């Protein structure tokens, strides 16, 4: 008669539980050792009792086996992440490709190409899009033209202001030059007679550089022909010649 099936549940009796733990622990360690020897497998076994006591077995060392385990887990995780990222990029590329093809079809339709497969409703939508685009283009053109006109008006106002300033400057300079010309004319025509000597004042410095001042003694000399001189002497009143000589003497 065989053994009955043992029900798997926690053993309430503390002593029985400790005895069962010791027996099965030893059996598990033995099985792990046998597996590593018979199958040339790298086996690591870690057991903690209910009191926290550690029992372990490692055919190649617990630390080495754990490092190998972590390395395999991380590589598998990295591989899974790389695979997931690759799939995500592939789906994204597929979406972008489909969107690009749709944009190309729309562009051809807007240019009046490949209109055969379109239905009446699609053609009406295309017509509305073209009308909207044409309206926006006209509005933009009008806006640019208005901006250009405003810019030209602004430049016109600036040029007008510059013209007024130049005109005012020329008027000021013209009045100044006229005043200087009149002053120079008065200087050229004015003569100072003092002590029987007539001294003509020279023009300003700029004119004085071109001509030298002249000093005239006596009355201004005028060329008179011989006949006229004889007539003047005959018709001159008495004492006029004496006055003329006195002018030279003085």
From Swiss-Prot:
Keywords: Activator, Developmental protein, Differentiation, DNA-binding, Flowering, Nucleus, Transcription, Transcription regulation. It holds the Pfam family K-box. SUPFAM superfamilies: SRF-like (SSF55455). Residues 1-61 form the MADS-box domain. It is found in: Nucleus. SMART domains: MADS. One of its GO terms (cellular component) is nucleus. Disruption phenotype: Abnormal and almost sterile florets. Mosaic organs and disturbed identities of palea and lodicule. Extra carpels or spikelets. Expressed in the floral meristem. Highly expressed in lodicules. Expressed in palea and pistil. Weakly expressed in carpels, empty glumes and stamens. Not detected in lemmas. Residues 86-176 form the K-box domain. GO terms for biological process: cell differentiation; embryo sac development; floral meristem determinacy; floral organ development; floral organ formation; floral whorl morphogenesis; floral whorl structural organization; integument development. GO terms for molecular function: DNA binding; DNA-binding transcription factor activity, RNA polymerase II-specific; protein dimerization activity; RNA polymerase II cis-regulatory region sequence-specific DNA binding. PANTHER family: SERUM RESPONSE FACTOR HOMOLOG. Probable transcription factor. Regulates floral organ identity and floral meristem determinacy. May be involved in the control of flowering time. May interact with the K-box of MADS1, MADS5, MADS7, MADS8, MADS14, MADS15, MADS16, MADS17 and MADS18. May interact with MADS13. The dimer composed of MADS6 and MADS18 forms a ternary complex with histone fold protein NF-YB1. This is MADS-box transcription factor 6. It comes from Oryza sativa subsp. japonica. The gene is MADS6.
